[in-house]
């Protein structure tokens, strides 16, 4: 049955109200509160019953047939809502706004909140280590503004983007934005691409009034302000969110942070492993020894936004150095940080009015350690201050029970002694319950019925229960009124018991209502501290990150780099921080990376799997570590400030446009040489390999010449085109490097040491042998290689290389494993692990 086909004049008042709400919230699933259940009707019911595997039933609504219906218990609603959100639905919560017991006529109901993938506030459904961003993309004809916010923390960011739609897409993907609001001017091609990524999109033009002007009052750019107000309208008006905890908008300006596109972040495996898409084996995984959820999120932000300001970087170094010097103090500080809960998201709960008793206890526990943290920060000379908010701690200490329930409408929230009125009601209630206990004893003595019990349930209230074996002792003069007969007993009431019941239940209702009102007062008082709590959260998250840097630096022997305004690179005995940690039973081979004022390009040759890609990634990661304020894995390090990093490492097809590997290579090369400056870093791994040999070699040489003569930025360029190494003779700012290997009796040993000069062999067949390819294949490949190397006639070569191959069929476990390796997408870390396992199998 479809809503559009029914005769609305016949609907019951309740169902008519539901249909009117559904007309307003057409794009949502409405959960309509009826007693202890949220119910769905018509198409919503059919869709949700299928999506969540619920029983589809029907409900009388005044029509000739029952309307489709399904329902979920209100106490378990969060679980079901979470499932719906993950399936891409929006959910509108329609609550009862008055007590059904006292309502006259139909109970008042209305939508109180709308939940979508970008506006989830249930922290149990979110990853505490990551932000959950909702974004607003504002198209102003010749560019875009992207404003995005994590509504659970109140953080809001805004940045101007070019009109390059691919750049916009990659920015959205890089931020992992869960939901997007766009204005009606939006580029239709871009909109189609966004929707193809399964990101929910809402188109609207309405801007919010100046209700939350305080968060953007210092911004003069009307485009940015309009983008912010577009997002605020969606959150405030359409989703009915209280945004009083929203912080001042941070404008992300290119002059402040090192620029990296999504390809660079993925190629360098900054926040997730390229192959598994998980944190493990990423730089974030290595550096994250934070003690708080806020610190973990802040660390991710640091890694994705390295600084350009040397003074700010050195301030971070100074704190890390101090933490290493004061190691006992640092450990005590980390112990204190462990006691701090997620203050940012607690502020969100206070603002939304969803904080319960347990949330306030978490706030109290966090406030308790602030004096100790403040004292330690002062000893460390930390550049930010915190306040302890002792008056708020005192309020929570004297008011909230140590073990409150999950809801705030059950009572047992407020401590004795906080409210004299509440204490009086509790005394009355306890006195009544004491009476019940005495009454049971007295009745046993008066009647002689030893099996007499006094019980309680919500249907009958208090009752007297007598088992069947004692029923013959019940007489009329006892004054018992039979109420219920069960299999093994009967239940009675009497006037005295009912009188006390009314008194007890009346006082308990009053207690629950008073506790609720007192709790709301206390929560509202906490809400007044949100700005102060957010400032404190910012300081704690930053010191947590720097404390993690100190711990990792001490543990893995990192050193403080020297950052200069020049362009020289001198990193001695450097290591790849992640690779060295995952090598099992093998010693990591460190390498120097030295590029003086006269050297802009290192052209790197060497065997496959020898470590060229690792060497290149190593410099990129060390540069990023240095610019986020972390010490680096080396014996000595002097580095310039890089404004941008461009990479092309590994081979993969485009995520969005479906372009081929070679096309993506050229697009990324184009982006690098178009936008790179003298202060940028370019890392190109075997550029040009995706096409014919001479095409690829020509392009590689032309790109190298352009970088050397026009851009003159620091560049690491690996290649198998050995002819390119002759460029060292004609380009003075290019130097050859090679990754050394030793060949003996047809076997190759990787030394993983980068040395001056070039090599003239790729050792591809040796690597194939090491990987476990069958001997027949290796022998045949060696023969063909000899033909090419001996420069036989072309026709003869073709004949020779197309002779029928009579390999014996032979399958082995190693062969099957080698076949299954995804060579194009494998990372150096994974390759090392796979080769190690294969080598063990063929020993």
Task: For each feature predicted by the language model, list its residue ranges.
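Short hinge/gating elements
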Residues: 59-70, 157, 212-218, 269-271, ...
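Short, small/acidic-rich helices and loops at N termini and domain boundaries
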Residues: 356, 837-841
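Extended, charged coiled-coil "arm/hinge" scaffolds of SMC/Rad50-like chromosome-maintenance ATPases
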Residues: 486-524
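Charged catalytic and DNA/RNA-contacting regions of genome-maintenance
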Residues: 1-322, 335-338, 342-351, 355-441, ...
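Charged, surface-exposed helical/loop "interaction arms" that form contiguous linear patches used
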Residues: 352, 356, 366-369, 416-417, ...
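ATPase nucleotide-binding head domains, primarily ABC-like/P-loop NTPase cores
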Residues: 42-45, 221, 291, 296-302, ...
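Amphipathic heptad-repeat alpha-helical coiled-coil/stalk segments that mediate oligomerization
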Residues: 206-211, 259, 274, 365-434, ...
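Active-site phosphate-binding and catalytic loops of NTP-dependent enzymes
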Residues: 94, 117-126, 242, 378-381, ...
């Amino acid at each position: 049955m479809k809503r559009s086909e029914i005769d609305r004049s016949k609907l019951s008042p309740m169902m008519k109200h539901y249909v009117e709400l559904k007309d307003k919230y057409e794009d949502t699933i409405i959960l309509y509160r009826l007693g202890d259940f949220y119910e769905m009707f018509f198409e919503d019911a059919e869709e949700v019953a299928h999506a969540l595997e619920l029983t589809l039933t029907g409900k009388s609504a005044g029509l000739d047939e029952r309307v489709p219906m399904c329902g979920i218990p209100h106490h378990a609603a969060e679980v079901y809502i979470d499932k719906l959100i993950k399936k891409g639905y929006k959910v509108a919560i329609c609550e009862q706004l008055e007590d059904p017991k006292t309502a006259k006529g139909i109970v008042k109901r209305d939508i109180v909140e709308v939940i979508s993938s970008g506006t989830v506030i249930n922290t149990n459904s979110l990853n505490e280590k990551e932000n959950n961003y909702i974004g607003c993309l504002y198209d102003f004809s010749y560019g875009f503004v992207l404003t995005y916010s994590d509504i659970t923390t109140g953080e809001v960011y805004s940045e101007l983007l070019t009109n390059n739609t691919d750049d916009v897409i990659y920015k959205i993907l890089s931020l992992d934005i869960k939901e997007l609001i766009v204005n009606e001017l939006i580029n239709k091609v871009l909109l189609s691409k966004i929707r193809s990524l399964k990101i929910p999109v809402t188109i609207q033009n309405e801007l919010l009034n100046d209700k939350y002007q305080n968060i953007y009052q210092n911004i003069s750019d009307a485009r940015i302000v309009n983008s912010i107000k577009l997002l605020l309208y969606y959150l405030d008006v359409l989703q009915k969110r209280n945004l009083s905890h929203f912080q001042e908008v941070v404008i992300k300006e290119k002059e402040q942070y090192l620029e990296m596109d999504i390809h660079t972040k993925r190629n360098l495996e900054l926040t997730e492993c390229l192959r598994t898409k998980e944190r493990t084996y990423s730089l974030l995984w290595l550096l994250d020894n934070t003690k708080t959820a806020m610190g973990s999120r802040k660390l991710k932000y640091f890694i994705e936004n390295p600084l350009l300001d040397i003074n700010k970087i050195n301030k971070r170094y100074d704190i890390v150095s101090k933490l290493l010097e004061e190691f006992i103090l640092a450990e005590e500080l980390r112990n204190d940080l462990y006691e701090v809960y997620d203050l940012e998201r607690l502020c969100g709960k206070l603002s939304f009015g969803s904080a319960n008793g347990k949330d306030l206890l978490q706030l109290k526990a966090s406030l308790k350690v602030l004096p100790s943290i403040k004292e330690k920060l002062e000893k460390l000379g930390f550049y930010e201050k915190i306040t302890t908010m002792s008056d708020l701690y005192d309020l929570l200490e004297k008011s909230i029970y140590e073990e409150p329930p999950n809801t705030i409408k059950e009572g047992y929230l407020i401590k004795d002694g906080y409210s004299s009125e509440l204490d009086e009601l509790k005394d009355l209630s306890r006195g009544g319950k004491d009476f019940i206990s005495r009454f049971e004893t007295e009745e046993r003595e008066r009647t002689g019925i030893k099996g007499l019990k006094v019980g309680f349930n919500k249907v009958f209230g208090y009752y007297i229960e007598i088992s069947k074996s004692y029923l013959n002792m019940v007489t009329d003069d006892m004054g018992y009124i039979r109420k219920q007969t069960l299999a093994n007993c009967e239940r009675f009431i009497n006037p005295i018991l009912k009188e006390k019941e009314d008194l007890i239940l009346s006082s308990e209702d009053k207690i629950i209502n008073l506790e609720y009102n007192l709790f709301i007062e206390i929560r509202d008082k906490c809400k007044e501290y949100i700005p102060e709590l957010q400032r404190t959260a910012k300081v704690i998250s930053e010191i947590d990150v720097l404390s993690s840097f100190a711990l990792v630096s001490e543990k893995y022997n990192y050193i403080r780099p020297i950052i200069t305004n020049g362009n020289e690179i001198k990193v001695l005995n450097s290591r790849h921080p992640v690779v060295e940690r995952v090598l099992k039973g093998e010693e990591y081979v460190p390498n120097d990376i030295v590029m003086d004022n006269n050297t802009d390009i290192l052209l790197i040759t060497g065997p496959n799997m020898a470590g060229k890609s690792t060497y290149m990634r190593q410099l990129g990661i060390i540069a990023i570590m240095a610019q986020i304020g972390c010490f680096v894995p080396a014996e000595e390090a002097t580095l310039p400030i890089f404004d941008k990093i461009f990479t092309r490492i590994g081979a993969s097809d485009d995520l969005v446009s479906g372009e081929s590997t070679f096309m993506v290579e050229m697009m990324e090369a184009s982006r690098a040489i178009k936008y790179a400056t003298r202060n940028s870093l370019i890392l190109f791994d075997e550029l040009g390999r995706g096409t014919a040999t001479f095409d690829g070699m020509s392009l590689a040489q032309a790109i190298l010449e352009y970088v050397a003569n026009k851009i003159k930025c620091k560049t690491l360029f690996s290649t198998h085109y050995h002819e390119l190494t002759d460029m060292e003779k004609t380009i003075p700012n290019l130097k050859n490097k090679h990754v050394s290997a030793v060949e003996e009796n047809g076997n190759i040993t990787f030394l993983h040491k980068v040395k001056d000069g070039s090599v003239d062999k790729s050792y591809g067949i040796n690597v194939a042998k090491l990987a476990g390819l069958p001997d027949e294949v290796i022998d045949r490949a060696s023969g063909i290689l000899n033909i090419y190397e001996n420069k036989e006639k072309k026709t003869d070569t073709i004949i020779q290389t197309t002779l029928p191959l009579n390999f014996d069929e032979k399958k082995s476990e190693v062969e099957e494993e080698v076949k299954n390796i995804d060579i194009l997408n494998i990372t150096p870390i994974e390759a090392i692990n796979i080769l190690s396992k294969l080598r063990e199998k063929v020993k």
